[in-house]
Amino acid sequence: MLKASLISIASYVPEKILTNFDLEKMVDTSDEWIVKRTGIKERHIAEGEITSDLGTKAAKLAIKRAGLEKPQIDTIICATMSPDHLCMPSTACKIAANLGLDYGITAFDISAACTGFIYLLQLANSLIKSGAKKNVLIVGAEKLSSVVDYTDRSTCILFGDGAGAAIISASNENEIIDIHTASDGTQSHLLITPGCGSAYPASDETLAKRLNFIHMSGNEVFKIAVQTLTKSVIEILERNNMTSRDIDFFVPHQANIRIIEAVKQRLDFKDEQCVLTIAKYGNTSSASIPMAINDAYESGRIKNGSTLLLDAFGGGFTWGSAILKFGGKNFYQI
């Protein structure tokens, strides 16, 4: 059977930085309060760029690092909860056009909120193993500043903009070992952007009620996330006869330091195994895991052959875990 490998990784963040001290001037909050509750010190905000721009810049670097020519990419899948356009075209199609791959390539979006990158891995893994595709570009890209209410201190402190991209290719080494994804739509109201879809079409009323922004029941989400992520990781480790000691790096979705620490302690991961970027990027939803992997890769921590365990939980609710060997035969070395 064909194997699928993550053969390149890249990320992009916009230049503007919004610090906690900047937010102190906008809402009733403080740097101390934000850091204590979330672990976030700053986040990047896109000005003059849209989601497809962010995704394109990460994608270009991922393709370069993979040593591939653009025509060798046969599929682009983008995970985003802040697409360029509500209905169409897909952000993936616009990224394809930006890359000059504007005819004949398979391109589509998925919506799995903060679990988006793990869903992307599962799709790409299946396409490669089935023989349907050879080189799949997966992109998690978010301009969350466009869907955040900067008068709501419970949410505006959390989110940032950015993109991460990876190439998944057919390979005989460093394979994606296992992926688990799941969902529970019965609790979707706890983390939701209510407006601008068919449930509450855009109107003066929905805009006045700020239904076009992210709404979150933070305490409930925290409890469910910790329980669900812990169970998800335990299941995937047991399914593969592994423990936390078989993992080189634990790369969680960067949502909130308290969630990460709670899950880490329950799973017995050591500090040196954990990849954390939340302090400088905040929560970038579907982009957070590839951005974190790329940071650890560029700093020399994650290397070709490293065993990674990824986990994420997001709106929907969606969640998932993945175990993979990082890199491949032609992996780009910094």
Swiss-Prot record:
<dbReference type="GO" id="GO:0033818">
    <property type="term" value="F:beta-ketoacyl-acyl-carrier-protein synthase III activity"/>
</dbReference>
<feature type="active site">
    <location>
        <position position="253"/>
    </location>
</feature>
<keyword id="KW-0963">Cytoplasm</keyword>
<dbReference type="GO" id="GO:0004315">
    <property type="term" value="F:3-oxoacyl-[acyl-carrier-protein] synthase activity"/>
</dbReference>
<comment type="pathway">
    <text>Lipid metabolism; fatty acid biosynthesis.</text>
</comment>
<keyword id="KW-0276">Fatty acid metabolism</keyword>
<keyword id="KW-0511">Multifunctional enzyme</keyword>
<keyword id="KW-0444">Lipid biosynthesis</keyword>
<dbReference type="GO" id="GO:0044550">
    <property type="term" value="P:secondary metabolite biosynthetic process"/>
</dbReference>
<comment type="subunit">
    <text>Homodimer.</text>
</comment>
<dbReference type="InterPro" id="IPR016039">
    <property type="entry name" value="Thiolase-like"/>
</dbReference>
<keyword id="KW-0012">Acyltransferase</keyword>
<feature type="active site">
    <location>
        <position position="114"/>
    </location>
</feature>
<keyword id="KW-0275">Fatty acid biosynthesis</keyword>
<feature type="region of interest" description="ACP-binding">
    <location>
        <begin position="254"/>
        <end position="258"/>
    </location>
</feature>
<dbReference type="GO" id="GO:0006633">
    <property type="term" value="P:fatty acid biosynthetic process"/>
</dbReference>
<comment type="similarity">
    <text>Belongs to the thiolase-like superfamily. FabH family.</text>
</comment>
<dbReference type="InterPro" id="IPR004655">
    <property type="entry name" value="FabH"/>
</dbReference>
<keyword id="KW-0443">Lipid metabolism</keyword>
<protein>
    <recommendedName>
        <fullName>Beta-ketoacyl-[acyl-carrier-protein] synthase III</fullName>
        <ecNumber>2.3.1.180</ecNumber>
    </recommendedName>
</protein>
<dbReference type="GO" id="GO:0005737">
    <property type="term" value="C:cytoplasm"/>
</dbReference>
<dbReference type="InterPro" id="IPR013751">
    <property type="entry name" value="ACP_syn_III_N"/>
</dbReference>
<dbReference type="Pfam" id="PF08545">
    <property type="entry name" value="ACP_syn_III"/>
</dbReference>
<comment type="function">
    <text>Catalyzes the condensation reaction of fatty acid synthesis by the addition to an acyl acceptor of two carbons from malonyl-ACP. Catalyzes the first condensation reaction which initiates fatty acid synthesis and may therefore play a role in governing the total rate of fatty acid production. Possesses both acetoacetyl-ACP synthase and acetyl transacylase activities. Its substrate specificity determines the biosynthesis of branched-chain and/or straight-chain of fatty acids.</text>
</comment>
<feature type="active site">
    <location>
        <position position="283"/>
    </location>
</feature>
<dbReference type="Pfam" id="PF08541">
    <property type="entry name" value="ACP_syn_III_C"/>
</dbReference>
<dbReference type="InterPro" id="IPR013747">
    <property type="entry name" value="ACP_syn_III_C"/>
</dbReference>
<keyword id="KW-0808">Transferase</keyword>
